[in-house]
Amino acid sequence: MIRLVTMRGRVQGVGFRAFVEFQATGLDLEGWVRNRRDGSVEALFSGPADAVEAMIALCRQGPSAAHVAALADEEAHPDQLRLRRAGERFSGLPTV
């Protein structure tokens, strides 16, 4: 299962990307996370459906300083995994 997830609200400047990277690594997911200039955080998760769904649930909550006002998720294409840094299973990417 591969899902593209976008979180909106107080999700930048609160450790959200580090939270996502830590949790996704713990769930043995592949993918990436990045800030967007519009103030949202975007992440791609790839792995077993139960692990991806658990990660999406964690994103709805976020780290303690965050407030997720909205979360959207959609199917993603495997080609989007190419955005990861070479040799990494899960990458924190630059802001777009």
From Swiss-Prot:
Single GO term (MF): acylphosphatase activity
Keywords, ordered alphabetically: Hydrolase
Listed Gene3D superfamilies: 3.30.70.100
Domain Acylphosphatase-like: 2-94
Keyword Hydrolase: yes
InterPro entries attached to this UniProt entry: Acylphosphatase, Acylphosphatase-like_dom, Acylphosphatase-like_dom_sf, Acylphosphatase_CS
Annotated EC: 3.6.1.7
Transmembrane segments: none
UniProt family annotation: Belongs to the acylphosphatase family.
Protein name as it appears in the record: Acylphosphatase
Organism of derivation: Rhodopseudomonas palustris (strain BisA53)
Gene field: acyP
